Structures are given as C-alpha cells and as structure tokens.
Regions:
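The Walker A/P-loop phosphate-binding site
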Residues: 10-118
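Long, basic/Gly/Ser/Thr-rich N-terminal segments
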Residues: 1-8
C-alpha cells in the first residue's frame, strides 16, 4: 500500500516528466521509419534527414568547398553526378524543400563568391527561392542562435519542410569553444 501511495505521489509530482518519458520511450512493437540518407559515399549514409553530420578540419583545408558540393547536390530536382559533388551522393530535392546555409565565419563577399561556385557546380544561374544562404559573422552569438532557430521555423513552414541545414562554423555558436 505504501509503495502504491508513493508511486502515485511521484507520478502526480512528476506528471510533466512522465508525459515526456512516454514520448521518448522506444515502442519495440512499432519501429520508427528508417532515416532517409541525404549524404552518402558508395551507398553508405554519412548524413541522414534526422541526424547531425559534422565536417571538421583545419583552416584552409577545403571545408567550405566540401560544403558547397553538398549544397549544390541539394539544390536540384535530380541527383547530380558524383563528379560535381566531390564523390558524394547527395539526395536531390524535387519538392523544393528549404535548403538553409548559415555561415558564421566568412565575410559577406566571400560567402557571395562561395555561393556563386555552388550555383555553377549545380548548373544553376540563379539561387532557387527555397535556398537561403545567410551570412552571420557580424552578429553576436546570442543573435546568431536566435536567427537560426526562428528562421528554421519560418522556412520550414514557407517551403513545406526542410531538406538540408548547413551551419558552417558551428563552433562560433558554442559559448565554451
């Protein structure tokens, strides 16, 4: 009886936590949908729609060029040949879902130049309306985080979903980095 009473008391006390727990618990009888690959190499997924994919490297090692190849692949209705995406298999974006590119490091002029390279790689002459490349170097860390959070929500609703989000320079968003 005491055990039941305590269980009820804690259940009432932590009702909000209990609701969150239920939503987080794995239901083995109802498996989740399989994650869809967005970035792969030789058929092996590196980045999926519901996970993070991180590219690291020293200054001047070509990270922005690599990011440009990923973005180029995400801009078209059909998959680009791997020669244009540096050997990566990038899932095409036939529905025109949002492709968001936030850069915290490059100057506005450099980001403009990089975007031009991305468009040429994708064989495009103009930025698709669902693609948003945003230069955040001039903003404070707090403002960058707010802008990213709110714009992702805005663009998700505007374009019917998000295909890809790239944050180039994510370390600049971390207080202790």
């Amino acid at each position: 009886e005491l055990k039941e009473l305590l269980a009820k008391m804690f259940s009432d006390l932590y009702s909000q936590t209990m609701m969150m727990l239920r939503s987080c618990e794995i239901d083995y009888e109802n498996p989740p949908d399989i994650s869809k690959s967005v970035v792969a190499v030789n058929g092996v997924p590196l980045g999926t729609q519901d996970n993070l994919f991180c590219i690291t490297g020293g200054e001047g090692t070509g990270k922005s060029n690599y990011v440009g190849a990923i973005l180029a692949g995400a801009l078209g209705e059909k998959r680009l040949p791997i020669e244009k995406t540096l050997g990566l298999e990038i899932t095409a974006n036939p529905k025109g879902l949002a492709v968001l590119h936030y850069d915290t490091e490059q100057s506005e002029a450099q980001l403009h130049k990089n975007l031009g390279k991305t468009l040429r790689r994708a064989s495009l002459t103009a930025v698709p309306e669902f693609c948003h490349s945003l230069y955040l170097a001039s903003l404070s860390r707090k403002d960058r985080l707010k802008l990213i959070r709110e714009s992702m929500d805005l663009f998700h609703h505007r374009h019917g979903g998000i295909h890809l989000v790239v944050i180039d320079g994510i370390a600049d968003l971390i207080r202790s980095a």
